[in-house]
């Protein structure tokens, strides 16, 4: 009896992470509206503030290299959307932020350091050079230079993150741009 109980308990302990991942992915439903800046994000984040960090295929993030990991406002991973043809992480479900830089710094902290942000402040405001350990200025390839590109609700932002005024339901995303 004891050996059977111990074997069952060990099996349960070994399978718990796999079952948790399966249940998390099965219960997370994503917005499917190509006209919405929330397309591909969890449905519970619709009309909430979200930040997404997308890493280049050539420079995948160590932790977020398979699809886009969704992290809620409490730092809990909700699941991974593998249908976005991108890799990275989105942190969302927020309300009430009005300053883009404050939102970015507060939301990325919830990834437990995996999305740490490095920036310099110059005459034009905050310049983001590193996200999640990837310093755009150190990238090499078939291009002259690289930078972290900011999008606001699916369009290139006309202002930097320090001057970005947030509204409810805004989606901010970062990806590597080159010239």
Q: What do these predicted ranges mean?
A:
Residues 2-179:
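Ubiquitin-like/PB1-type beta-grasp interaction modules and other compact soluble beta-rich domains
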């Amino acid at each position: 009896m004891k050996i059977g109980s111990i074997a069952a308990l060990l099996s349960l302990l070994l399978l718990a992470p796999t079952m948790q991942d399966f249940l998390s992915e099965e219960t997370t439903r994503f917005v499917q509206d190509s006209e919405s800046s929330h397309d591909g994000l969890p449905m519970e984040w619709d009309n909430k503030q979200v930040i997404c960090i997308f890493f280049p295929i050539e420079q995948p993030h160590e932790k977020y290299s398979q699809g886009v990991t969704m992290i809620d406002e409490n730092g809990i991973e909700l699941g991974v959307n593998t249908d976005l043809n991108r890799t990275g992480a989105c942190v969302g479900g927020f309300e009430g932020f009005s300053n883009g830089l404050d939102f970015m710094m507060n939301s990325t902290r919830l990834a437990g350091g995996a999305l740490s942000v490095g920036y310099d402040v110059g005459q034009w405001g905050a310049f983001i050079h590193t996200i999640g350990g990837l310093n755009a200025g150190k990238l090499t390839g078939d291009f002259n230079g690289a930078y972290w590109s900011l999008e606001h609700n699916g369009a290139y932002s006309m202002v930097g993150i320090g001057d970005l005024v947030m509204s409810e339901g805004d989606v901010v995303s970062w990806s590597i741009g080159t010239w």
